[in-house]
Amino acid sequence: MTSRQSRKSKMALVPKQRQNLARTVKTVKIPYATTQIVTTSNPPKKGQIKVSGRQLFMSLITSSSFVVNNGLPTPSLLSLNPSNQYLFPSLAYEAANYDLYRFAKLRLSYVHDTNATVSGRVSLMWDRDSQDVPPNSRVSIPQCTKSVSTAVYESCAIDLPIDDVWRFVRDTDVVDRKLSDYGQIFTAVHSGSTTDEVGDVYLDYTIELKDRQPTASMVQTAYWDVSGVLAKSEGPRYFSPSSDVTFTSTMAAISLQLSGIFNVQVVVTCTTAGTLVVGPNISVIGAMYSQFTTPRYFAQPVLACTGVPNGTPSVSMTGFAGITRITLVITRLPPETRCRNRQFP
């Protein structure tokens, strides 16, 4: 018998059951923890939107002297950013949902509503730097990036140059605004013989918004202390913390330059509470709630502001003593608040 035949005969002696068991043995894999990589894209580029509009933002009042922006005390109030509540009161709420913007069209126009018997001149200007100081004389008008001038009884317009740069929608006060703003615009009147309203200024715009984000706050919160160490403002700019608010240890004054209806909450840390009164460009809707519990005075009025500046502050607090800190919380309300909510709060 050969060796090959010998091996075959030995395999034949192995029981069939044993052979089947050998064939059914399986390899068991030990499980390991696995992870997943999650990527997001919010939103895709095709998700950007385009908005067009025409906004009346100022009615010019002629003057014999050189007056810029109707005498508005706030610097850079007319900066071109969709978050600017003064220039874009409706667009600002839409822009609060996006990170980036770019203008596709900008046209600044003056429409007269007076006749040729009224003297004076009107100038419209655009400056590429939103932090430049306003012009202070007629000589400064041609020094702006672009300008146009005419008699108060002639309409005029200026098309602003457009670039293709995406900028950030400003959702709070920033140190260097020129990085987010597309310059600023100015209006000026001079050489008039009266102080009458002579015409309206409009801004026509087409803007693109992209990169949706959680809605930015539409409530401005600002606070200061008398020593000046603590001063901060967050949210949209209904007023300028640096120029629209003045206060000492015994008084405080606030100037509102925006036309609209606002819910204002004032908290004053003090030793003695005084009175809160409103100026000529403000009317109180309903009853004003106020309370003083040492060491804090609290007031919550609903104010309707005309937006027309004058020498008197919009809100004045007098007769106080020992003021150390002031907190303001301002929210813009819809126009129908005037009719439906006269008893607020």
Curated annotation (Swiss-Prot):
- Disulfide bonds, paired cysteine numbers: none
Q: What Gene Ontology molecular function terms does this protein carry?
A: RNA binding; structural molecule activity
Sorted keywords for this record are: Capsid protein, RNA-binding, T=3 icosahedral capsid protein, Virion
A Pfam cross-reference name: Viral_coat
Cross-referenced Gene3D superfamilies: 2.60.120.20, 2.60.40.4030
- Entry's family note: Belongs to the icosahedral plant coat protein family.
What this protein is called in its record is Capsid protein
Q: Which organism is it from?
A: Carnation ringspot virus (isolate Lommel)
